[in-house]
């Protein structure tokens, strides 16, 4: 530990972040992570407490691209991350930059302005949000409305669709 910078070596999935004095928004996570636990790390820091104000990760390029996807390319992963912060692909890192080179390309992924503010402002429970989101992506070939019926119920869903003038597709 030196002034404002503190480095910790720990198992990121097992560590008690609070023991390091980290509070919501007063720390950043900057890491070269094992690619196979990217989802678990994002879930831990975005959905859990305390939350960092930002994350900068070296991740598998394809995963980073899925996270920053827009329009019709959105996924459960990209919406999950965007619900808490603003992801940005900073730079692609070719496999040749490493020795020995891995079998995949990498990318630097930054997630800024991390908070649960969107949930608090709208009075949403994080757990319920993800329940609905997962139902929406449950069956790719089905219409979103059909996927959501099991979670929200037909009557409530019809009301939402009418109120927002949504296309059933």
Regions found by a protein language model. Give the residues of each.
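Catalytic cores of RNA-modifying enzymes
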Residues: 1-131, 135, 162
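C-terminal lobe and adjacent flexible extensions of AdoMet/dcAdoMet transferase-like proteins
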Residues: 113, 133-169
């Amino acid at each position: 530990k030196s002034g404002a910078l503190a480095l910790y070596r720990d198992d990121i999935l097992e560590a008690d972040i609070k023991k390091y004095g980290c509070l919501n928004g007063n720390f950043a996570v900057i890491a070269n992570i094992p690619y196979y636990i990217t989802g678990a790390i994002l879930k831990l820091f975005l959905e859990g407490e305390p939350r960092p104000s930002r994350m900068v990760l070296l991740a598998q390029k394809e995963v980073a691209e899925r996270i920053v996807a827009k329009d019709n390319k959105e996924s459960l992963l990209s919406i999950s991350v965007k619900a808490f912060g603003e992801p940005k692909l900073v730079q692609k890192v070719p496999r040749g930059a490493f020795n020995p080179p891995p079998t995949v390309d990498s990318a630097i992924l930054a997630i800024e302005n991390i908070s649960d503010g969107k949930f608090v402002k709208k009075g949403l429970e994080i757990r319920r949000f993800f329940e609905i989101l997962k139902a929406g992506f449950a069956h790719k070939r089905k219409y979103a409305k059909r996927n959501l019926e099991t979670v929200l119920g037909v009557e409530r869903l019809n009301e939402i669709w009418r109120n927002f003038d949504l296309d059933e597709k």
